[in-house]
Amino acid sequence: MKIIDKLTEEVLNNKYYNDLYKKCSLLSADINLKIKSSKYNLTSKELNDSLRFADILSNSTNSVARNNSYQIVTYLNSHYSENEIYKTVATAVYSKLGNFPAINYLNTYNNNDAILPINREIEVEAKKLIQKVPDTENIFFTDSQFELYSKLINTLEYSFSGPTSMGKSFIIKAFIKKVMKNNPPENLVILVPTRALINQFTIDLKEEIRQLSKVYKYRILTNSNISDFSENELHNYILILTPERLISYLSQESNPPIGFIFVDEAHKLTNEKDSRSVTTYTAIEKTIKKYGNIKLYFASPNVSNPEIFLKLFNRNNVNSSFQTNESPVSQNLFFIDLLNNKIELIQGKNNTTIESDALFKKVNNTTDLIQHLGKGKNNLIYCNSKSRTIEEANNFSKTVVNSKMSTELKKAIKQIENYIHPQYYLANLLKNRVAYHYGKLPQLVRNLVEDLYKNEDIQNVFCTSTLLEGVNMPTQNIFILNNKNGLKKLQSIDFWNLSGRAGRLSRELFGNIFCIQHDNCTWDNKDILNKSEISLTPTVLTKIDRNIRKIEKLLKNQEISGTQEEKYILKYIANIISVDTLELQSNYRSPVIDKLIEKNKNEIIELAKQKVKDYSIPSYILNSNQSITLSTQNDVYLELKKNNKKGENIKLPNSSKIDYCVCLEVLEYMYKIYNWKNGEKKLQNIGSLKYYALLMNQWVNGLSLSQIIKQSLDYHENNMIDIQVDYNDFVPFKRGNQKHINIVIEDIIENIEYVLRFLFEKYFNHHYQIVASIVGEDSAGENWASLLEYGTQNRIAIALQNIGLSRHTALGIYENCKQSLTIENGKLKKVNKEMILARFKVGSLEFDEINRIL
């Protein structure tokens, strides 16, 4: 054992050290809770000893010791930042940890100009030289970031995990820049769980690689339609895709090969209660099958066994995973019980009750608490559902007085009123520097909220589990108002992923997490607060292990018990097993088939073979559409093939003929042929098709969101339509009621995002694939799935969206700036950014987005 390791062990087990560590943490807690007390002030000896312990621990390789070292110095910062000994030791500790953002904080906010001994200075300069981020000026990796980056660039497959605040996206972007310089160049896919993340990652990456992409001829795309561009010179691609879009990319034989796939938020593969975890598995498995030697990488937060993701896909090389608990920012976790007037500082097994009578004299409810503890700070407030998020934001906003608005904030309010509606809640909330944020919020509005928050133009953002999807909104404080995600209990992986947003690198040394027990949320079990190792198992493996009998029943076409979502996931997995048996003839065994063979479940494999052996539908269509019932797919194929033989037209109408009547006719046709009455819960009511046809017609014909909303509000008013204001409460719509207006707006946004752009798109894409397989792609007509995805029939507007622009801006460019676009053979070849910007008003939504994306 090295001397430093022995010394570290002695320190961590030393009672005096542990007493000091606790006192330092309570001193910091009093400040964060605004409890004015001198109870935990340190004597001179205690201060010096605490700093000496921190200095010793910073030399360790033990991540617990290094974290403790960081935390001691951070705990003491608010009280002792002007103390000369503190200044020197703080600089020395952060330097030893390679935490350059923390050193920058000391210089910027503490005016810390401490000079280290010459040997320490040399060590710091050497570390800077080695850990400088490529293609940047004065930006350096922390020690743990550099260790990971060094391993990443020297492997062909890797899986890594660390705290949310570690800066995994930062490392991924540095890795991408390195890959772009490879010779020969290769195409990359960044796989993200949601469309919201596509936009965020695209914006961040474009800012990072703007110059490199010109030099190395890389183009960033956000969808699978590469053919929408006219190419005179060869380009390479960085594709930022959801699992669904990757599956679509794989189904297009003309698309170029992929050399790298980087799976961000890989823990989503283990979410047993979300069918998209199975879609993610399918997308990755199909990619590996198609491009056998593809380089494969996984990134996940707070997972103790990151190697599990490589093992899932039979990639199990030694030394191909990395896990660390070392974080460049610290988090203070408090449990505040408003029912019993109690506060606990949570520190693993050493939780401490904090005397807090003075606090509870000022605070009676969650709003009081957020205003008191969050005053003058950036606060994210987590709620468990969209409706609760909007409700809490509105209630909180009513208590805010005399909120001064910045120029940027005033501009954003005007933009949202024009883009959505003047009575939209969010526009009113922003006047009090309050906002809400959820996954299906329109892309442009999400961007506005995130930018306003990042730049501190707004202070309090109420949000849903969108933060759990990886949306990058670091904050000073997080208030957790509910311990559920929807109706389900928050899982440990989700809780710590959410909590990890507290603390903004370079802006502060720590963040605060306040878990609140109140009238609407009781924490019967607080185990989730005590951080422990989080070991995960992918959904497909878990379901096969625990539900093999149910899967067997499904393969026999028998009914099974369980919730709708559970049954859907098991049907999905049964489909995957069945389709995968078709590959056995070519000696390819998928991970799922391998798992069944390993468990001696050959009878399941045989059942699956029997299920599909007489199917006529081409296997590549089944492969691309495993979430649609296999028998339905085959029935549709046989029906269309029979109709084609009779000489009937099996194509959908040409896009130039689309109106309300055509949309309704097509939806009724799809309802019948795909058996939505029995196979798709959301679409089983045939009466709802009239509404969806109306919305679909407006959407694919390019109406703006504000126009769609206005027409819908007119329709509701003129026809006295009943709207749902509560769980079982329906009332006639009233135009003068702001709540009614917002219910209609939220319904429209939800139906565009989920029904049109997800459900309908899935079925229309499947229909197009079948038609193309029967009559050939050149004769297959329009793929309505593209019209639904992009909300336009215009190929140029589609191409503009594919490079990262929103539908709104893409349509605006096409309508107002055609002369700025070089179009060749009906395809987009080149965009003149300067000419386009000249046509839009400075400060408009469109101007800001064009400036950022193009």
Regions found by a protein language model. Give the residues of each.
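N-terminal helicase ATP-binding lobe
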Residues: M1-L854
